[in-house]
Amino acid sequence: HAVFNLVRLSVPLMKDGGSIINTASVQSKKPTPNILPYGATKGALANLTIGLAGVLAEKQIRVNAVLPGPIWTPFIPAGMDEDSVESFGSQTPMGRPGQPVELASAYVMLASDTASYTSGTLLTISGGAVPL
């Protein structure tokens, strides 16, 4: 409910032409069995993004989401066994996990005037791995 409530409370304060960018995940399209609850919540966020894009279009407020694939963060080694940490991201066509800095340009672009006609988009940043 947090994202929905945040949007509900912030939209009246936003100027027309604003931008909302959610962070979903490639797990929203193709969930991994051992983290189904995570995939389900990210799927809900992706659908909320698309729905809000339609509802807020009349105010010229754009709503998009970034769907990261495997991205290396300090939390990765804390939550995985050693073998999983070593192979993390190796299943992508690029053969490695992404770095947080590699996501930055997606958010900057979606927040900028360059994306003034982009709304309802789920932008996948995943090293070439395409969720179905």
What kind of region is each of these model predictions?
Residues K30, Y107-V108, S119-L132:
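Short C-terminal tail/terminal secondary-structure segment
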